[in-house]
């Protein structure tokens, strides 16, 4: 694996103040490097964005050039995903919910499968 495949991780943010720190830490700590991070603030009324921005400033400032934060009025999950998709510039996109978390090598495993199979779409089970 040579990090030649680019991935955009798209995460709508709405009402996840209690989950956003663990989620963002897991996403921004991926072992794979060629990632664009797109966080879509879907008009959340809680402190989700403050927590996210604080985490980026304190722990992930070295990734700021790879992070896009898009603010929009609340339109629901499909509209937020579409907004993120419109902003994505990578070869592949990965939609993830902001109350979930990723293992440190999740994206690497996805890219390994893309390279192994030359797939356009990769589908996999989630661990609960």
Where are the model-predicted features located?
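Nucleotide-sugar donor-binding/catalytic module of glycosyltransferases
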Residues: 1-128
């Amino acid at each position: 694996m040579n990090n030649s495949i680019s991935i955009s991780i798209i995460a709508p943010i709405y009402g996840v103040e209690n989950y956003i720190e663990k989620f963002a830490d897991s996403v921004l700590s991926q072992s794979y490097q060629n990632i664009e991070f797109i966080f879509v603030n879907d008009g959340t009324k809680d402190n989700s964005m403050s927590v996210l921005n604080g985490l980026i400033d304190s722990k992930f400032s070295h990734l700021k050039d790879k992070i896009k934060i898009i603010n929009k009025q609340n339109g629901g999950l499909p509209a937020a995903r579409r907004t993120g998709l419109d902003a994505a510039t990578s070869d592949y996109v990965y939609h993830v919910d902001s109350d979930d978390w990723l293992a440190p090598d999740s994206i690497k495993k996805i890219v390994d499968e893309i390279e192994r199979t030359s797939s356009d779409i990769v589908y996999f089970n989630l661990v609960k």
